[in-house]
């Protein structure tokens, strides 16, 4: 994997900097590194593909070295370099694709394709190493079963979940009370509602709670907490739990009271925030508990009182909500996030070449399925294919 990254980094630099008119002295170190890559690869043969519709390709290396010059690089020099660069880039691209479409239930962190296994040989250690990639650093740590740490922006840690629970219900569905939520990606939105606006509740107050368990521990997380759930702020028709009918939800938004958010790790509270909105932090956690209240306004203007009558029919439904958004966090496991395209890169290659479903990943690389059942085998394989995808993205956009 280190060699593949170093190849890709060398080729990217060469493609960007070996251009007509450039002073040789400005790229002499790069050309020396480029020539070392050629010397190391010359005389070797590789084969990629042969799975799904990914075609078998044979690769043979026997390229001449780039020479020295006292002047600027001319068109002939650059054309010679380009022919070599293009072949190497095509090779790296195919090695990456060959690796991204393979999986293994055992030791999935290790190279799975013949070509990448061959590049792990001692001969190729002479290629200049560049381990500045976070993915490469963590792949090396995971390969040695040491602790890893990925920094994510808006990590996709929450499997998609959208539903509701009713604490009070009737066959007519005309006086309901309960919670509804949408968990997806890095965001939780939860709303508590009471058609009667807590008219008969103790102290005219309804208590709501929403607990979300993460599939992996997050650390040093920066989080946004807002006293609103905009996705539940407009009327909608909702299917009943048994699917026999539908019911109407017509929210009128109130501000939640006594808001508390707890971050827990193995059942122990690590951080607690009460009535604090905006940016908060959490040290480490695997569970989030949100609690909040809907309180009937003690004083109402006639217009507000008309919204919340003391008896049925209740045409407007008192609603309070919260939004919790994980802006950034560190996780020992690899995740999809908002700042990278690794999941899309891997998935698109597997779809394009009709790769058959293997023993580890779900069909279509369904992220909700993958993260819901995030086994050690899936974690190893995902880290490997994401690392390869990060290498490929240096050369192929």
Curated annotation (Swiss-Prot):
An example molecular function term from Gene Ontology annotations: structural molecule activity
GO biological process: fusion of virus membrane with host plasma membrane
Region annotation (Interaction with the inner capsid protein VP2) ranges: 62-73
Residues that bind Zn(2+): 153
Localization: Virion
PTM per Swiss-Prot/TrEMBL: The N-terminus is blocked.
Keyword terms: Calcium, Capsid protein, Intermediate capsid protein, Metal-binding, Ubl conjugation, Virion, Zinc
Main location per the UniProt record: virion
Pfam families membership: Rota_Capsid_VP6
Any one GO CC term of the record: viral intermediate capsid
InterPro entries named among the record's database cross-references: Capsid_hemagglutn (IPR008980), Rotavirus_A/C_VP6 (IPR001385), Virus_capsid_a-hlx_vir (IPR008935)
Chain sites annotated for binding Ca(2+): 266, 286
Record function comment: Intermediate capsid protein that self assembles to form an icosahedral capsid with a T=13 symmetry, which consists of 230 trimers of VP6, with channels at each of its five-fold vertices. This capsid constitutes the middle concentric layer of the viral mature particle. The innermost VP2 capsid and the intermediate VP6 capsid remain intact following cell entry to protect the dsRNA from degradation and to prevent unfavorable antiviral responses in the host cell during all the replication cycle of the virus.
Similarity annotation: Belongs to the rotavirus VP6 family.
Extra information: The VP6 trimer contains a zinc ion located at the center of the molecule. The zinc ion is not essential for either trimerization or transcription activity of the DLP. Zinc-depleted VP6 has an increased sensitivity to proteases.
Protein's name in the database: Intermediate capsid protein VP6
Organism of this sequence: Rotavirus A (strain RVA/Human/Indonesia/69M/1980/G8P4[10]) (RV-A)
């Amino acid at each position: 994997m280190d060699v593949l990254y170093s190849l890709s980094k060398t080729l990217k630099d060469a493609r960007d900097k070996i251009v007509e008119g450039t002073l040789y002295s400005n790229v002499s170190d790069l050309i020396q590194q480029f020539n070392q890559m050629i010397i190391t690869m010359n005389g070797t043969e590789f084969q990629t593909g042969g799975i799904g519709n990914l075609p078998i390709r044979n690769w043979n290396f026997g390229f001449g070295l780039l020479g020295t010059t006292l002047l600027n690089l001319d068109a002939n020099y650059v054309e010679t370099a380009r022919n070599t660069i293009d072949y190497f880039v095509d090779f790296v691209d195919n090695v990456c694709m060959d690796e991204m479409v393979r999986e293994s239930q055992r030791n999935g962190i290790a190279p799975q394709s013949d070509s990448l296994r061959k590049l792990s040989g001692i001969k190729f250690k002479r290629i200049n190493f560049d381990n500045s990639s976070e993915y490469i650093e963590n792949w090396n740590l995971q390969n040695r079963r040491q602790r890893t740490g990925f920094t994510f922006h808006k990590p996709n840690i929450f499997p998609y979940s959208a539903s509701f629970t009713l604490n009070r219900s009737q066959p007519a569905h005309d006086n309901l009370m309960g919670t509804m939520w949408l968990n997806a990606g890095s965001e939780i939105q939860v709303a508590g509602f009471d058609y009667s606006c807590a008219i008969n509740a103790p102290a005219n107050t309804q208590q709501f709670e929403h607990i979300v368990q993460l599939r992996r521990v997050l650390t040093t997380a920066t989080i946004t907490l807002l006293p609103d759930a905009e996705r539940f702020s407009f009327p909608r028709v909702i299917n009943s739990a048994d699917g026999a009918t539908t019911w109407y939800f017509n929210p009128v938004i109130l501000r939640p009271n006594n808001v508390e958010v707890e971050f827990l790790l193995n059942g122990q509270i690590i951080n607690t925030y009460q009535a604090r909105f905006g940016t908060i932090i959490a040290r480490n956690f695997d569970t989030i508990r949100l609690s909040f209240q809907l309180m009937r306004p003690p004083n109402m203007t006639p217009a507000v009182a008309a919204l919340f009558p003391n008896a049925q029919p209740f045409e407007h439904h008192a609603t309070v909500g919260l939004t919790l958004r994980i802006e950034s966090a560190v996780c020992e496991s690899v995740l999809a996030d908002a700042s990278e395209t690794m999941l899309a890169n891997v998935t698109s290659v597997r779809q394009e070449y009709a790769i058959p479903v293997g023993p580890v990943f779900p069909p279509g690389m369904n992220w909700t399925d993958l993260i819901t059942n995030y086994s050690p085998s899936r974690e190893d394989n995902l880290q490997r294919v994401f690392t390869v995808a990060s290498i490929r993205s240096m050369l192929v956009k």
